[in-house]
Structures are given as C-alpha cells and as structure tokens.
Amino acid sequence: MEFSVKSGSPEKQRSACIVVGVFEPRRLSPIAEQLDKISDGYISSLLRRGDLEGKPGQMLLLHHVPNVLSERVLLVGCGKERELDERQYKQIIKKTISTLNETGSMEAVCFLTELHVKGRDTYWKVRQAVETTKDSLYTFNQFKSNKPETRRPLRKLVFNVPTRRELSLGERAITHGLAVASGVKASKDLGNMPPNVANPAYLASQARRLADDFDTVTTKIIGEQEMKELGMTSYLAVGQGSKNEAMMSVIEYKGSADPDAKPIVLIGKGLTFDSGGISIKPSAQMDEMKYDMCGAASVFGAMKSLAQLNLPINVVGVIAGCENMPGGNAYRPGDIITTMSGKTVEVLNTDAEGRLVLCDALTYVERFDPDCVVDVATLTGACVVALGHHISGLLGNHNPLAHELINASEQSGDRAWRLPMSDEYQDQISSPFADMANLGSPGAGTITAGCFLSRFTKKYNWAHLDIAGTAWVGGKEKGSTGRPVPLLVQFLLNRAGLENVE
C-alpha cells in the first residue's frame, strides 16, 4: 500500500477515483462544489433527486462525471458539518476504504483530509487517515486453509492538502502514520496468535528478530535459570505450573547521540495464556485469555515503530513472557513469595498473577537508571467495569509523567484516563502474614493493583496503563486492537521533540 500527498484541484486529478465529502442535508463540501461547478451542476442535480442525503457513512459512486479526468467520483456522507469530530472522521475514512476496496479502485485521490475536523490540523488528519486505512485493511488469516483475496485491492492512496506549504507536513504525517501502523500490526499479529504458537519462547524469538532487523536495537533474553540467580521468585512462581519456560526479553534501542542519556523504559505484561492457575477461570471465553499478553505485544509494537522512526532517544522495552497454568507444581493461594526487591507477598488468588510478574520486572529495570518507566498490562477486570472498552486506565507516582501520557493519548486518539491512587487505598492490600497481599479487599480493583505495583517503583518516575478493556475486542469478531501502540509512540515522539507543530 502506497501513500503520498499532493496539492491540486480535484478536476485535474487523473485517477481511478476521487473521494470528496457531502454534508447533511445534501450540502456539498468546498471540494465537491468545485467538481459540481466544473461538471455543470451534475453532482448537485443528483443530490436534489435524493440519491445521497449526506448522512455519516453513506456512499455514492459516480462514473464518468462530465469534465472530470478521473474515471469515478466517490461521494462520502459526512453528517452535519459542525458535528464532524475526530471519531466520526475516522469512521468515515474506514467506510471509504472499505468501499474503495470493494469496488476495485486500485488507486484514489482522497480530499477528505481537507474537511474541517474540530480541533485537529492537517498533520493529524493525514496521519489518522493513514493509520485508519492500514487498520481497516488488516487481516489475520494465516491459519485458514482458504484465504479470501480481494480481486482488485486498493494499492495507492493520495491525500490532498489545501496548500503546497502543507506538503511537508503531510509527508511527515505519512511517515509517522506508517510507523505507528506498522507497530499496531505487529502488536495485533502477536496478540492474535494462538497460545500453542505464541508462548514465551515465541515472544523471545520475535524480540531477537527485531534486533536482527535494526542496527539500533539489541536484545537480551533472560530465562528461568538467570531469573533464579537474580532472585525473581515472584515472576518464576507464576510460570512454574507450565511446561513452557518463562522468558523475559530485554530490548534496548539506542538512538540518542548522548551515550549516557537515561532511557525511557516500557514494560509489557506477557501472559501468553492465563488460565487463572489453581484459582482457575470460568471456561466461557477462556480462549480470549491468549490476549493476556497484549501489554507485551504493544511494547513490542512500539519498539518496532520507534526503530523505524529512528528517534533520537534511548528506550528499553521489556517483554515479561510467562504462562499461568494449573498443575502439580503450580503456585497456590496461601503461598508467601519473596520478590526480587525483598518484599514478601501473600498469594490470595493465583489469577491476580500479572502484578506478580510485573513487580519483579519493575525491580529489574532499576539497573538502567531510567528517566521514567511505563508498564502496560491487561491487569484488571475492574478497569473494564470502570472505563469500559473505549479508554485505558492510567495510574502513576509522578504527575508530570501522567500528564504527558494523557496528552499523548489525546493527540493520538488512543485515549487514557487517570485514576486516583491515594494512600487510603494502600490499606486494602495489607496482609497479616506478609508485606502485602496480591489481591485487594473488595472495591477499586484497578487502583489497588496500581498500589501493589507502586511499592516496587520508589526509585524512578512511573506510570501504569491498564489495557484490560482496550487491548482486544471479544465475541464473534474477536481480535487484538493493537492499543496502546499509538499512545506509546506519540509519547516517544513527544519525548524526542518531534510532536507536530504547524
């Protein structure tokens, strides 16, 4: 799929298809008005006849419009002009791409990027169009024996920008959008893999491949023997019921000209399958517990995007791969575990395992003297109750870092919402026998999980993203979303000083 930007009049575009917008009720966008004028009112006459109202997602494909060089013109319903926001814009792009693909338009010039979207500039509109296009065309069918193929798939998309001065802005948006889309695809592919393939060793192999593909990336794999030597007893306890060895992949990206620049650290929970262990989960939808490694998948995707963008910063990505299974050697409710930090944990529920893996990873990364640490995890069902499936949960111990991440979430459209983590909640994870319990008393489950993790982050600025509600979509159309790769990449772009300014 090839993307480019240009600035020109619609009637002069020689393409398989031109894409322009129509607002409710039957109001032509400025670009559509130009086409209507050059075609002697051909388009407006169709609208008066009632062929298209302009409601969001409505499509009307016109052939051989008078005096227009392109073979076809696709009219796209955009709803009411004043109500066109970022969510509706992305939905319109998605429906447009689907229509172009279905109708055999192998190339198109898209003028939707010239529409006014509340609070968004040309860079954002082009970048979101690229990301949405790539996401719309994503398929995961490598395990199907019969793979459906589009007869004449969309291969080239040109986005028009209002002035030539904005061409460089559009080109940068395409570069950034393609990198984000590449990371999202990598994350989705990992998440959608079946757990009999995507075990901790598979995650490690993908981390090694990333180092093979980019000179700026090195990867170290830490297996169970080294974990024992490091004292990562909590991490090991979670995986000891599985025949698949726990493996932690440490991916280092060095892009800063200053070799001593402190790195940003990203940590991803990588439970390649979470049965719940001895505290076993209900069988309904247990298949979706292959998605319990989506935190690790998103860190992997963000590291891939980062390497493609060649950003001038240092970043360490940690993929905490593990499998939580019941068995004769599995850890039990009632066990007391000594973590790598020396703190002890009473296990109340073996299905609250993500925090037991993450706490040792959080201690491990102290050796990098990080500028900040962000962990990403499908950690709590309570986050789904609190925020649903649209917004990720955010907690942390450093207000400026939390604000940076919220800002990146707004810029990217991959939203997060900060939850409180005041001292009162810490009492909910107290234990009569150990320093803490791995499960809080009823209420505020996402916050008490954050409180647990916070006890292992005293030496650096830290934030936690709970993506339990946003990492995948369940049900018949189940699949990984690739989130929060866009948020993470935007955060890294901002840290590199490459946030967009028109």
From Swiss-Prot:
Pfam families: Peptidase_M17 (PF00883), Peptidase_M17_N (PF02789)
Keyword Chloroplast among UniProt keywords: no
Gene for this chain: pepA
Protein name: Probable cytosol aminopeptidase
Organism: Photobacterium profundum (strain SS9)
NCBIfam families: PRK00913.1-1, PRK00913.1-4
Binding site residues for Mn(2+) 1: D274, D351, E353
Keywords for the protein's UniProt record, in alphabetical order: Aminopeptidase, Cytoplasm, Hydrolase, Manganese, Metal-binding, Protease
Compartment list: Cytoplasm
UniProt family annotation: Belongs to the peptidase M17 family.
Record note on cofactor: Binds 2 manganese ions per subunit.
Listed EC numbers: 3.4.11.1, 3.4.11.10
A GO molecular function held by the record: manganese ion binding
Catalytic activity: Release of an N-terminal amino acid, Xaa-|-Yaa-, in which Xaa is preferably Leu, but may be other amino acids including Pro although not Arg or Lys, and Yaa may be Pro. Amino acid amides and methyl esters are also readily hydrolyzed, but rates on arylamides are exceedingly low; Release of an N-terminal amino acid, preferentially leucine, but not glutamic or aspartic acids
Active site per UniProt: K281, R355
Function per UniProt: Presumably involved in the processing and regular turnover of intracellular proteins. Catalyzes the removal of unsubstituted N-terminal amino acids from various peptides.
GO biological process entries: proteolysis
PROSITE patterns linked: CYTOSOL_AP
Annotated Gene Ontology cellular component terms: cytoplasm
Cofactor(s) the protein needs: Mn(2+)
Residues that bind Mn(2+) 2: K269, D274, D292, E353
